[in-house]
Amino acid sequence: MSISIRRAKPSDIETIQQFGSKLLNFERENYDASLDSNWALSDEAKAKYLDAIQNKYVIIAELEEQPIGFLIGSIIEPKASDARQIKQAYLQNIYVDDDFRKTGAGKQLVAAFKKYCQDEGVKRLNVSVLAANEIAIKFYNTVGFKPRSLSLSQEL
């Protein structure tokens, strides 16, 4: 079973929207009922995903030419007004279909993004994860992420 990673193309938009919907649905059902899993299928989401394909780093994991997952990431250039003057990247979304988890696809997606970031001179890679999502936290720890900051929120 050989998984390949490739850059996304505009023709992948429906696949990316479906993966995005599955990701939001999983997070809504398990961690945050305020999420709208149908948003990923909207015209607004389509426009954002197309923009990401053209202006960010979007990759697809495939098994025998069938898409099984995706990752969206972006590079953040420091602004002159920033106290921290290092080039950073942000892993925005990662999803692997249920049937293909534990195959290494997620690790390969992250490894490809890390290499891209290193080639672009990025010094720090960041990701945010829901605190209750212990599976994702364990995965991110496995691929080298460590806790750096803590974000707190309060429902009103």
Sequence positions of predicted segments:
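Conserved N-terminal entry element of GNAT/NAT acetyltransferase domains
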Residues: 1-14
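Conserved GNAT-fold acetyl-CoA-binding loop/helix
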Residues: 24-48
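A short helix-loop-beta-strand connector motif used in the catalytic cores of GNAT acetyltransferases and
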Residues: 48-60, 90
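Conserved beta-strand in the GNAT
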Residues: 60, 66-75, 95
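Conserved acetyl-CoA binding element of GNAT-fold acetyltransferases
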Residues: 84-98, 150-153
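Conserved acetyl-CoA-binding loop-helix of GNAT-fold acetyltransferases
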Residues: 93-96, 102-115, 142
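Conserved active-site alpha-helix within GNAT-family acetyltransferase domains
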Residues: 107, 131-149
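Conserved GNAT acetyl-CoA-binding A-motif
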Residues: 117-128
